[in-house]
Amino acid sequence: MKLSDMQLFRGLEEDDISSLLSCLNSVKRNYKKGEVILSEGSIIENIGIVLSGMVMISCNDIWGNTSILGSVAPGSVFAEVYACIPGQPMLVTVSAVEDTSVLFMNVGRVLTTCTNACPFHTNLARNLLTVCAHKSLQLSQRILHTSSKSIRGRLMSYFSECAKHAGSNSFLIPYNRQQLADYLNVDRSTMCNELSKMQKDGMVEYKKNRILLKD
């Protein structure tokens, strides 16, 4: 994926982006599968942009239970909220689901016009606001998916959203079974049993991460 195709850089040409990244002192870093990128409790000043791979956002309670809050695909941004609030410790952990490359940019430089008066800062700041709005929407979607009292209701709410996004009744989800259970805030074994029942009832078919919603 080209940088100009990413939401954060929308409206900018590749040459403009190269100049902008130099101005922002951006840094590219690579992470192995399972490696922690940002830890809960960290205080950060940088926005992360996934260039390749996949990132998972999670949090742990004091008993060690993990909740999956979402995933971040190539072209998407993470940690922007914490970077924009000075001194705010992170409430989540960010880790690499697979080998992942991340571009980091200092949020202060993004939001403040540099001495070179780069004309691209306004576009970038506007795009960042749009990104934050989309993240708020994603959080609202998770609240919607977990509002049902039944596991079947939570699964169908999430699968319905995925199907709409894919434009097809057949789609891939970014989670394994444990991660999906954590995302929907349900027990993994109970969820897997419910999935089997849904398949027997002719509601869905599934194989690993491929889901098919039946008519």
Q: Over which residues does each language-model region extend?
A:
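Cyclic-nucleotide recognition modules
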Residues: L24, I68-R126
